[in-house]
């Protein structure tokens, strides 16, 4: 039978808790020592018991003080780097915001100029540049208008051609129907004439047949 997952929780019994602490502490220090030797790492272990008693272990290649100083130095370097990174980000955000605000102001001014307001605030060169810009925009608008009108005319022409083709198709069908009727009429004229009520066939044009006299 498979055992369930063991639940880790605080040992309430004091004596049992102390015994477990002693065993686990010894095993932990042993594992730390093995890790420092096998992997050649600088390792420090600090333990405060429930009664605030200090236990520590440090690998032979260094001391606990050196490890703590190195740790503090690394943390300060990381904090400084993070602070510098965030400062650079904030500075970039401020610059981007200022650039966008200037762009918005320029757009507002351009809109006012298109409405004819604020022209008295422009210099001669600015007025000349604005005039050239308006002429260029007007040329583009006229070109687009001509293109649009050409497309409209082309569509109307295509629709008219389709209507004519449809009408020609109907006329052609009518002509074919009339031709078939004429062919049927000619065919009936070529067939032998039907017999009259007395059983004697009618005479055809261009033939001479005499009715035989009765005996």
UniProtKB/Swiss-Prot annotation:
Residues 143-172, 184-215 are annotated as: Disordered. It holds the Pfam family K-box. It comes from the Eukaryota. It is found in: Nucleus. Residues 1-61 form the MADS-box domain. Residues 90-178 form the K-box domain. GO terms for biological process: fruit development; fruit morphogenesis; integument development; negative regulation of cell growth; positive regulation of transcription by RNA polymerase II; regulation of timing of transition from vegetative to reproductive phase. GO terms for molecular function: DNA-binding transcription factor activity; protein dimerization activity; RNA polymerase II transcription regulatory region sequence-specific DNA binding. GO terms for cellular component: nucleus. Keywords: Developmental protein, DNA-binding, Flowering, Growth regulation, Nucleus, Transcription, Transcription regulation. Expressed in bud pedicels, petals, anthers, style, ovary, seeds and embryos. Forms homodimer. Interacts with AGL16. Probable transcription factor involved in the regulation of fruit growth. Contributes to integument development. Controls organ size via cell expansion. Involved in the regulation of longitudinal growth of the fruit evenly throughout the radial axis. Functions redundantly with TT16/AGL32 to repress nucellus growth and promote its degeneration. PANTHER family: SERUM RESPONSE FACTOR HOMOLOG. This is Agamous-like MADS-box protein AGL63. It comes from Arabidopsis thaliana.
